[in-house]
């Protein structure tokens, strides 16, 4: 996505470290109730930096007035990498104040080595743990919302992708496959990438009648990315790249 596609997540610009083609947005689509893609002139309202368009992700509306909590659970399985995932959410209101609503949501995913048609891609497993909590208050004229989300993912990098020299890379390309392949495993070893993205968003909307509608929003995001490679002298546990990005 880089700097050509803008992501609006729950009303806030998604700010991650967008400097590599293998860095996907740090968002959990299961958290969203509505995803909208905007292209063309309509995207000007979000700024001039989104040349490729805008992806707007919004959480479902709060269940104000709902008497009993309700939830959902969904599971997923993928044959390539024997990936499985589970996501669930629970929402409701306070028993004594139905105009105060809350929601909790979480997703866990686990994948092992991926494969092509003829061989395994060792060390390409993934682990993901994402969760969010939100609450809202609605008095008719005044609405207040608060959202906190945590996105955590670890992704293995295929052993054959880290080459010691250009000659070795040329040899692997000529062979058309890795020299050695191990049996399937879910274990993630070096090299790998690990990212943790945290976000907190606050919104206030007040309807002043004839004076108009006033809207205020603020957000805080913190993106922690670490990339570990196979290093000599047992120093693989020291990240080759460790970047921390905070934004308000």
Question: Each predicted region: which residue ranges?
Answer:
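Outer-membrane beta-barrel proteins, especially TonB-dependent receptors
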Residues: 1-4, 9-248
């Amino acid at each position: 996505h880089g700097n050509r596609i803008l992501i609006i997540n729950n009303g806030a610009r998604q700010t991650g470290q967008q400097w590599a083609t293998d860095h996907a947005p740090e968002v959990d689509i299961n958290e969203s109730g509505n995803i909208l893609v905007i292209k063309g002139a309509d995207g000007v309202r979000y700024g001039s930096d989104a040349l490729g368009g805008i992806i707007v992700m919004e959480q479902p509306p709060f269940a104000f007035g709902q008497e009993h909590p309700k939830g959902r659970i969904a599971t997923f399985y993928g044959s390539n990498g024997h990936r499985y995932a589970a996501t669930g959410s629970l929402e409701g209101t306070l028993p004594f104040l139905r105009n105060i609503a809350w929601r909790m949501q979480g997703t866990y995913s686990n994948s092992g080595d991926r494969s092509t048609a003829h061989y395994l891609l060792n060390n390409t497993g993934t682990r993901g743990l994402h969760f969010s909590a939100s609450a809202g208050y609605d008095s008719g004229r005044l609405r207040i919302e608060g959202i906190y989300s945590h996105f955590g993912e670890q992704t293995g990098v295929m052993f054959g992708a880290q080459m010691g020299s250009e000659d070795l890379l040329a040899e692997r390309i000529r062979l058309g496959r890795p020299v050695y392949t191990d049996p399937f495993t879910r274990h993630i070893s070096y090299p790998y990438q690990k990212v943790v993205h945290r976000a907190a968003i606050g919104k206030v909307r007040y309807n002043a009648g004839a004076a108009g509608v006033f809207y205020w929003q603020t957000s805080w995001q913190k993106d922690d990315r670490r990339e570990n490679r196979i290093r000599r002298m047992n120093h693989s546990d020291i990240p080759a790249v460790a970047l921390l990005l905070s934004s308000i």
